[in-house]
């Protein structure tokens, strides 16, 4: 018979933790190899196994209610039932581009959890504002998280990023952010560092044990404010309207310097990453507008969190008018 009583030792739930992370912690607490926990509970897990079949027996073994476990682990959330309390705004674990990262180590310690925790997260959660730790791009384990108290502009950029999603909509900011990173770091690769800013930043971010962050991680942290500013520019509609009306992107290019993203920026050739992105961006919109399909927009611009039901989003920033004929809200 399957075990229906809690295991001798249980572990605390952690918000948005991945199922594998939770199973690993529960197994470790009971001195079991991770791959032996589910067989002990007589739970068979394969790629074709519906995830919710694990919910009831796992909740019993963990000594928590079914509802508590369901709300803690996004894999158990039903994305087709967005009006269920606690689901709206949670990471979509089934998304192909869903992000898993280590939780802030100081947050887990504050929760009384000693073992590492991996969470489903969203593109904007790069800084833990409570503890001023970099927890985003470039972090693969909790020990790599860097205290960024000495670079307050990066902390402010986290708040700016959050404000951008309120202004433009999470869907569009999320779509622009990875492209902004790619564009900006391509620019950096072709520029010199005459003042050795990178080495100075690495020395500034060296921890108490004398360990400096890796070069790529330092770049991600130091230039995060510029990446966020570029994200806001690309996610906005002003440049799009001006480009459609005039047939050129002069205004967009001027804003790169005016907003302090890259001083003196002038694209020298059509292969410039920003120009290539603009062409690709308009091609996607023209393709979607021609087919006039919401599914195509959902494929090109997926929602990374569970959205509210359709009737709640009539005037939401998550939907937009197509910039090309035939005009319709997508």
Can you name each region flagged by the protein language model?
Residues 1-330:
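Basic, alpha-helical nucleic-acid-binding regions used in initiation and control of genome expression
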């Amino acid at each position: 018979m399957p075990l229906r009583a809690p295991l001798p030792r249980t572990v605390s739930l952690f918000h948005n933790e991945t199922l594998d992370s939770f199973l690993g912690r529960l197994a470790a607490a009971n001195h079991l190899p991770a791959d032996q926990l589910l067989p002990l509970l007589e739970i068979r897990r394969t790629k074709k196994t519906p995830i919710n079949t694990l919910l009831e027996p796992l909740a019993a073994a963990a000594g928590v209610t079914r509802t508590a476990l369901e709300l803690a682990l996004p894999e158990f959330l039903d994305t087709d039932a967005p009006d269920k309390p606690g689901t709206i705004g949670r990471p979509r674990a089934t998304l192909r581009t869903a992000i898993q990262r280590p939780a802030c180590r100081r947050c887990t310690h504050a929760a009384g959890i000693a073992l590492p925790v991996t969470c489903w997260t969203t593109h904007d959660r790069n800084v833990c504002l409570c503890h001023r730790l970099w927890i985003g791009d470039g972090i693969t384990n909790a020990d790599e998280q860097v205290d960024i108290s000495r670079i307050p502009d990066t902390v402010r950029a986290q708040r700016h990023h959050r404000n951008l999603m309120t202004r433009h909509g999470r869907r569009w900011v999320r779509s622009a952010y990875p492209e902004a990173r790619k564009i900006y770091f391509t620019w950096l690769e072709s520029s010199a560092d005459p003042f050795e800013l990178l080495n100075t930043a690495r020395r500034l971010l060296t921890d108490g044990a004398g360990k400096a962050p890796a070069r790529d991680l330092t770049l991600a942290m130091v230039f995060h404010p510029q990446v966020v500013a570029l994200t806001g520019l690309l996610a906005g509609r002003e440049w799009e309207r001006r480009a459609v009306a005039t047939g050129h992107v002069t205004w967009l290019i001027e804003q790169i310097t005016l907003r302090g993203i890259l001083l003196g920026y002038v694209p020298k050739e059509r292969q410039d990453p920003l120009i290539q992105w603009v062409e690709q961006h308009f091609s996607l919109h023209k393709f979607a507008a021609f087919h006039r399909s919401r599914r195509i927009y959902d494929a090109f611009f997926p929602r990374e969190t569970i959205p509210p039901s359709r009737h709640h989003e009539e005037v939401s920033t998550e939907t937009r008018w197509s910039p090309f004929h035939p005009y319709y809200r997508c």
